[in-house]
Amino acid sequence: MRRVTIYTDGACSGNPGPGGYGAILTDDATGKTREIAGGEAETTNNRMELLGVIEALSLLKRPCEVRIFTDSRYVADAMTLGWADKWRANGWMRTKKDPATNPELWERLLSLCEIHKVTFHWVKGHAENPMNNRCDEMAVEKSREYREKG
């Protein structure tokens, strides 16, 4: 099975406000990398964190073993601690009275994780990790582009 490493980051200028995401995919066998970035005019930082992971996984054309590195506790914890699966099983409710946010994005992410063998790893943001820092640069740039269009 092909192994891929993905770094992602999201950014938002205001929360909500214009936002962006950046991701870097690396084929572990060849070292070949691909950068992607995107954004939305009115969004939240958590939506951008999720969308970065979703868009990166969506590029994979066949099932892969994937390691995802993110500085988002929201994404990393929800996936590694099973929260997202629990929210889905409970009809996208975190508790009896508290709905999960971004259910349509979580559904997309969980569906992609059924295709691929995915592990999530949290990394400290704005630290000495060049891949995470590059993703942050792309996310901030996209957020800036949407703010200037605004």
Where are these regions (language model features)?
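RNase H-like nuclease fold core
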Residues: M1-R47, L51, E55-C64, D136-E137, ...
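RNase H catalytic domain
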Residues: A11-P18, I54-R134, M138, S143-E145
